[in-house]
Amino acid sequence: MQQTGLTLALVALAVCVALPSSEAILPIASSCCTEVSHHISRRLLERVNICRIQRADGDCDLAAVILHVRRRRLCVSPHSHVIKQWMKEQAAKKNTKGNICHKKQAGKRKSKGAHQEKPEIHSHKSPY
């Protein structure tokens, strides 16, 4: 009976040790796009605030262009003709400095509470 209690205690200890390490991995996995859309309207592209490029060679398994429109995050295929053309247009605009899409920074692990992004403040007023 005493050996069963010792075995149970060792199993409980192993579970407790394993839990914190798996929680550290979850914030990275939850920020990756798991599906991409192959179609996107030009009207929606006009409302993009931020664009990020997700590569398939890092922490994420799928290549994607992440578009931030208001409070939504849209994952679009980087092979979409409309996205490629839109990215070229954004880079060519005089008021943008370089490309509007930035590479997603990999390797930064955040604590569970620090996963939330701060809202962005824009100087232009929305008609809505």
Curated annotation (Swiss-Prot):
Disulfide bonds join 32-60, 33-75. It comes from the Eukaryota. Residues 89-128 are annotated as: Disordered. GO terms for cellular component: extracellular space. One of its GO terms (biological process) is positive regulation of cell-matrix adhesion. InterPro entries: Chemokine_CC_CS (IPR000827), Chemokine_IL8-like_dom (IPR001811), Interleukin_8-like_sf (IPR036048). Residues 1-24 form the signal peptide. One of its GO terms (molecular function) is chemokine activity. Belongs to the intercrine beta (chemokine CC) family. This is C-C motif chemokine 28.
